């Protein structure tokens, strides 16, 4: 049974002109336990909206979203946060306290999680933040902010972790570091979904790629099925990553690895 099911979901935003802008119109999508999924598509395709719907920050206008077979329509974000966590594109939005330690501990404290102090120590060590634990997260480097935001995101042991543009605005070395971290998440969370424009990250990391365009899923498949289909790429205006093109040229798939 899928972790999450979108059933005929529609949602619209009220524009500055006062009219409704339809983001999704009858969206159907299933997310299965244990998957590593990448959402791709042009700006405005609905990637961030889909994630906000999953964590309850937005509610569908029509249709429903099921979590483990149960409707989430009447559930609050706080109720869903034990199962699904969203790490924002801008890590600064994850920092609400004056130290990383306090930020990581906060969600556990307000929910009376047992052994929250030990869990905080564990996450600080796991994401190499122990020496930075008393620092204000907003004053860290880009890579340190990313690691801290991931630690906050997994504090409640969510079964599903959503990451919005996890490698945006990072230098090459920091980007590689975050990619290694994403690859090594199996013991922390079962299912990971990213929304990204980083096609190399998609090629190297994702098992499944969902392509969004104008509020619809226009393609859903493996790396080879998506990046090897020029019609799909043209539809959403993206180019296959160089690493995939090299693999095709050499008739080898070893360049795209998990």
Task: Show the residue positions of the predicted features.
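Catalytic Walker B motif of ABC-type/P-loop ATPase nucleotide-binding domains
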Residues: 161-164
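Conserved ABC ATPase "signature" region
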Residues: 114-132
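Conserved ABC ATPase signature
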Residues: 136-140
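The feature captures the beta-strand-to-loop junction immediately N-terminal to the Walker
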Residues: 40-42
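Conserved ABC transporter NBD signature motif
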Residues: 63-71, 80
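Helix-to-loop junction immediately C-terminal to a conserved catalytic motif
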Residues: 55
């Amino acid at each position: 049974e899928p972790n999450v099911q979108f059933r005929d979901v529609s949602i619209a935003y009220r524009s500055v002109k006062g009219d409704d802008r339809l983001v999704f119109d009858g969206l159907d999508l299933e997310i299965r336990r244990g998957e590593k999924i990448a959402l791709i598509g042009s700006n405005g395709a609905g990637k961030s909206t889909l994630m906000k719907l999953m964590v309850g920050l937005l509610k569908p206008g029509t249709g429903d979203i099921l979590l483990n077979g149960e409707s989430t329509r009447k559930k609050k974000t706080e109720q869903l946060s034990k199962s699904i966590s969203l790490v924002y594109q801008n890590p600064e939005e994850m920092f609400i306290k004056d130290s990383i330690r306090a930020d990581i501990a906060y969600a556990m404290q307000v929910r009376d999680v047992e052994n929250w102090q030990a869990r905080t120590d564990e996450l600080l060590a796991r994401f190499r933040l122990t020496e930075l634990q008393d620092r204000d997260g907003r004053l860290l480097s880009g890579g340190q902010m990313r690691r801290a935001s991931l630690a906050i995101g997994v504090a409640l042991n969510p079964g599903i972790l959503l990451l919005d543009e996890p490698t945006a605005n990072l230098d090459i070395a920091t980007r590689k570091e975050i990619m290694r971290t994403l690859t090594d998440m199996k013991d922390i969370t079962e299912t990971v979904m990213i929304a990204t424009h980083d096609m190399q990250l998609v090629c190297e990391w994702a098992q499944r790629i969902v392509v969004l365009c104008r509020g619809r899923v226009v393609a859903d498949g493996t790396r080879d099925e998506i990046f090897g289909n020029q019609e799909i790429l043209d539809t959403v205006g993206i180019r296959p990553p160089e690493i995939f093109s090299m693999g095709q040229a050499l008739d080898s798939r070893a360049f795209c690895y998990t």
